[in-house]
Structure formats: structure tokens, C-alpha cells
Amino acid sequence: MAARNWIGLFSRGEGNNLTNALERGYEAALLIQSLELEFYADRKVRPELELSVPRSVQATVLRRFHAALQICRSSLSTVTPNRGQLDPQELRQLQLIETVVSRYSGKRSSSKSGMSTAPELLPRSLLGVFDSVRRQLDPSSEESVVAGFRRRRDSTLASLRILLLLVLVPLLVQQVSNTYIVGPAVERLSPDLSFLSYPKPQLEEVAVEKLRIYKEELEFDALLKGQEPLSSDLLVIKLRERAQELKQEADQESVQAIKNVLADLAGLMAFVVVCLVSRDQLRVLRGFLDEAIYGLSDSAKAFAIILFTDIFVGYHSPEGWTVLLDGIAHHFGLPTQENFILLFIATFPVILATIFKYWIFRYLNRVSPSSVATLKGMNGGG
């Protein structure tokens, strides 16, 4: 039993090393592509080329390029022997690393004129078929496939577990602290500490409006029943009683706002603690989400993008942002500022749309060009 546990621990550690090497190589390949796009007009990085930037900046760019290329080569040598254990998303990441490394490998021989390349003896596709058949006939291929399946299963379970922890732990901490810790403490201390039940202008305005409506209801009820109007003394007594009730309601709402703030802070701290403790699981969750997202078809990706943009930055998004901001203000006991809401609606969706378009241009256009083409077609060519 101990031997099996040790072997399982070793295989999991080997899988983690493989995943880390692949992630480091993939991030380095993306860095090289970003350097190509930003400084070399989407062409190869050429150290001998003088850029229209200061020499210190060019030296930094070349230093980052060489370091990233070395990481890609090291990652490729580590991951390639275990290619059979990779899932489709990881295979796409490996293909990107191979593309970047082959671009700077210098193995492509050019003719004397420098305009043509020497023809290959066999097509690469045919060589790929031979390599696939060789891997399938390899005696160790079954073990490699089983190991890859187990690693993907463990990755899925770890992703679901950390996802549940990220959702449930902050919610439970917020509810428990609000009910059993923060709530009783604030209610006990609020009569002695004035800042825990500070008056709020919007609550006073609501209370005055309710008191005015109550007075009109008394007069209307007397008219309906054919009774004499209430005397001034009796009316003052009833209004005083109602004013005391409204004051208690306003104080309770003020205390509840303080409870919400403290309980939400406790939930936020719990979320941060979970993130700090589970960094490795968060990397696994990131890979799982990438695989789930990139496993969608091009039409599904384009549909999700259009749905997201229409909800948050579309034509009807101002109404949604207004409701959301009003709810947040009421939750924390803050006054609703119409000018702030209008300013937020006029600026934040525009900033969000700009960031989203930049992401499509810099990242999605490289990773999935067909999704961008489908998105343009579904969005009316825009």
C-alpha cells in the first residue's frame, strides 16, 4: 500500500511538473508573439534590426525575447516525450510553442537567391501520420493514455473543488458572521456608539414622507367613516407615535447597513485567504476553464461574446447598471446619487467595450481567428 501511494504521489508530481513546464512555455510563446506584434510589425524578431526606440528599450526587448525563447525550447524538450498525456487544449498550447521554436530554429535552408526553400523529401502530413501510427503501436502507449486520462480526471475534480470553495466559503463566512458574530455585536454596541447608528439624510427623507402619508391616511379615514376630524392634540399624539416607529425603522436600517459592510469584508477576506492558500489549484482551474472555453465551437464562442457585450455594454445596459448601482447603494446604506449613476453609465461601459475590443484584437485574433470571423459575421460585419 505504501509503495502504491508513493508511486501515485510521484506520478501526480510528474504531471504537475509537465503542466508547469507547458504553462511556462505557452506564456513565453505568447510573450514572443506580443514582442513581434508590438516592435517588429508582426514579423520575426531580428536582433540586427534597429528599432525606432531608445537603445535601452531595444536591449530590454531582446533580453526578454532570448529568455522567452530559451524557456520555450526547454519546455518543448520536457513536454514532447509525454505528448500522449496531453488533452486537446494542452496540445494546442504545445503546437503554439512548436510554431514559435521552429520559427527561430534556423533549420530552414534557403537557396542562393534567398527566395525559395529546399523541397522536403516527404510531406509533413505524411510524416505526421507515420508518427501517429508509431505512437499507437508503441507498447507503452496504453500506459501513457491511461496516465493522461487520470491526470485529466484529477484536474477536473480539483477544478470543481476549488470552484466550489471560491463560491461557498465566502458566502458561508458572510452569512455566519452576519448572523452570529457581527450582527449581535453591532446591535449590542450601537446604543452606546453613535457612529454605528449615524443618521442618514435619505432615511430621514423617507421617514418624513411616510409620516406625511400617515397623516393624510388618518384624515381620509375620518372622512370615509363620516367622523369628525381628529383634534389637534389627538393628531399630534398619533403622529408622535408614528414618528417614533419610523425612527426605530431608520435606526434598524442604519445598523443593518453596518452589518452588511462588516460581513461583506469578512467574506472578502475569506475569498482572499482561499486564493492565497490554493494557488496551485487556481492554476489547474485556469487550465480547466481554458479547455472548456476553447472546446466550444466558433459559433458558440461568437454567441457567448455577443451575449456578454450586449448585456454589459449594449443598448439596454444602462437600465441594468442603474438597477445594480441602486441595489448596491441600498445594501450599504448609501444615498442614491443620480449624477454619479449617470456619470458611471456614460464612462464605464465605454471603457469596458474598449478593453474587450483590444482583447479581441491582441489575443483572440491570434488564438482563434475563425471565431473572430464568425463574430464579425454574426454581428453584422462590424
Swiss-Prot record:
The topology of this chain with respect to the membrane is:
Multi-pass membrane protein
**Membrane-spanning residues where?**
162-182, 257-277, 305-325, 340-360
Assigned keywords, A-Z: Cell inner membrane, Cell membrane, Hydrogen ion transport, Ion transport, Membrane, Transmembrane, Transmembrane helix, Transport
| Subcellular location as annotated | Cell inner membrane
The keyword Transmembrane appears for this protein: yes
Question: Would you name any one GO CC term?
Answer: plasma membrane
Molecular function terms, GO-annotated: proton transmembrane transporter activity
The reply on keyword Glycoprotein is no
Protein family (similarity comment): Belongs to the CemA family.
Q: Write out the function statement from the record.
A: Required for H(+) efflux immediately after light irradiation to form a rapid H(+) concentration gradient across the thylakoid membranes. Together with PxcL, contributes to transient H(+) uptake following dark to light transition.
Matching entries from PANTHER family are given as: CHLOROPLAST ENVELOPE MEMBRANE PROTEIN, CHLOROPLAST ENVELOPE MEMBRANE PROTEIN-RELATED
Record's protein name: Proton extrusion protein PxcA
The species is Parasynechococcus marenigrum (strain WH8102)
UniProt gene name:
pxcA
